[in-house]
Each structure stands twice: as structure tokens, then as C-alpha cells.
């Protein structure tokens, strides 16, 4: 399971070191793609295959489904972890997520998310994420 929040620096070549716990879960190669909320999603090859199977079931007759599939798959790339534990984040993905110098890498159960510091701080300050509202949603979900 991928959990935790880590702050790292993107070097001038677009590389970032992944936390060792995340490297163990994701493997030497994994998929990185555009995520929701202007962050990046990273999936192990196994989790990506599971996700692909689910997404194959989306109706191609739906314009929204086609748009989502294009968004999600066109931005995807296979990343390989180097001997120093770093990955190279392609320029198009760095631009999409506004990744500059400092980034937050978080674990969200079956995926990682890579956030720019600015976007992460804004997300955490979002009033709709108050503890009370989260508790209410958890109760609604029976958690």
C-alpha cells in the first residue's frame, strides 16, 4: 500500500528522487500520467493493467469517455527508476502539473501523486476538505 507524504526537489534535468517505500511498491518501471486536480498519477505496471481493464469498459459512444481516455492515456509514459532512485519526469508532464523546484509525492493506496508545492498547499487549504466535512463523508460511506 502506498501511503505518506514526502517533499522532494526536481533537479534541473527534470529528475526527482522517489521515496524508497514507493520504489519498492511501484517497481523499477511504472506508469506516470496526468492526474486530476493538476497533479500526476503514478501506477505500478500491475495496477495500471487493472485500471486499463476497467477503462476498456467505458462506452466509446460517450464523448466524455473518449475525452477522458485521450487525456489519461496520451499523457502517460513508462518511467524507469535509475540507480540513484530517481525518475525523469517528461517536460509535458512537468508543465501540466506546474512542477518547478519543490514537489510533494504522496501515497494514495494504489497510486502515487506528484504535486507542485503551490498546488499541494492550495489543495490542503481547500475549505471543502475540512475535518468535519471529511468525517461526514466517511459516515455517509459507512467508514
UniProtKB/Swiss-Prot annotation:
Entry keyword set: Cytoplasm, DNA-binding, Repeat, Transcription, Transcription regulation
Taxonomic placement: Bacteria, Bacillati, Bacillota, Bacillota incertae sedis, Caldicellulosiruptorales
InterPro entries referenced in this protein's UniProt entry, alphabetically: MraZ, MraZ_C, MraZ_dom, MraZ_N, MraZ_sf, SpoVT-AbrB_dom, SpoVT-AbrB_sf
Pfam family, one: MraZ
GO process terms (BP): negative regulation of DNA-templated transcription initiation
Compartments where located: Cytoplasm, Nucleoid
Family annotation (SUPFAM superfamilies): AbrB/MazE/MraZ-like
Oligomeric and partner information: Forms oligomers.
Domain SpoVT-AbrB per the UniProt entry, residue ranges: 5-47, 76-119
GO cellular component: cytoplasm; nucleoid
GO molecular function: DNA-binding transcription factor activity; transcription cis-regulatory region binding
Keyword field contains NADP: no
Name of the protein described by the UniProt record: Transcriptional regulator MraZ
Family, similarity comment: Belongs to the MraZ family.
Amino acid at each position: 500500500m502506498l501511503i505518506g507524504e514526502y517533499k522532494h526537489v526536481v533537479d534541473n534535468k527534470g529528475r526527482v528522487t522517489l521515496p524508497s517505500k514507493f520504489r519498492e511498491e511501484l517497481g523499477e518501471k511504472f506508469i506516470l500520467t496526468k492526474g486530476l486536480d493538476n497533479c500526476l498519477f503514478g501506477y505500478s505496471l500491475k495496477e495500471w493493467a487493472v485500471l486499463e481493464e476497467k477503462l476498456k469498459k467505458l462506452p466509446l459512444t460517450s464523448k466524455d469517455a473518449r475525452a477522458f481516455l485521450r487525456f489519461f492515456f496520451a499523457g502517460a509514459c513508462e518511467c524507469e527508476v535509475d540507480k540513484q532512485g530517481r525518475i525523469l519526469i517528461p517536460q509535458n508532464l512537468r508543465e501540466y502539473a506546474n512542477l518547478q523546484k519543490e514537489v510533494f509525492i504522496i501515497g494514495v493506496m494504489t497510486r502515487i501523486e506528484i504535486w507542485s508545492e503551490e498546488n499541494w498547499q492550495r489543495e490542503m487549504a481547500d475549505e471543502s476538505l475540512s475535518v468535519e466535512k471529511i468525517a461526514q463523508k466517511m459516515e455517509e460511506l459507512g467508514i
